[in-house]
Amino acid sequence: IYAMKTHLFLGMDNLSKMGKRLKINTPIKENASSALGTTEINMIDYSNAFITLANEGEHVTPHIIEKITDNNDRILYEFKYQNEKVLNKKYVYILNNLLTETYDYKMIGYTSPTLMSISNDLDSKYAVKSGSTETDYWTIGYNKNYLMMVWAGNDDNDKVKARDSKITKKIWSKTITKIKTNKKEWYEIPKGITASSINPLTGEYKENGIVCFYEKGTEPNYIDKYSN
């Protein structure tokens, strides 16, 4: 399991530390299974973390009320935006592009990406992630203009049915595609990032392979031995 191997390689305390940097207020336990999502995290905490990715490494606190005025238009309350740089923009760009592969037909191999059921619904580029437990399903996705999360479960915390696993994915995809804007929806490539065509099975360069993004100097510069 790649997530767990990476978690153990980096040190179990690093996941907890990163959670705090991303404003996840729920304490993440420092054990091996935390990499698989065994810590229960609420929607606000999830949104806190993914907002930072959607905002290219800068965190903005999620809020419900933007402004309150009286009948004379005097401002009684107004939310104050305070952006905080949390992550390096270059690495966030790489991660955001990786999260577009969750619904990419090109990534079908020994198994299918987890969001293939919504691939045909999407008419723009989004970074999307989904998750599930015995008691709930969730899907979260974004571009540079919008972030939306959908959760489904039972009020009594009863187990959910496997046949309902696509519910949050479909609600998310059908709703997000109704939101239109004239603004550019995907991110500009930051300085210091380059693209390379690779064989995803080996990570080596392959002409007409899958395009992945790298920090300059780390891209593969050797030919995939399995290339045609």
Task: Give residue ranges: language-model regions.
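Active-site-adjacent helix/loop patches that line small-molecule binding or acyl-intermediate pockets
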Residues: I1-N55, L98-E101
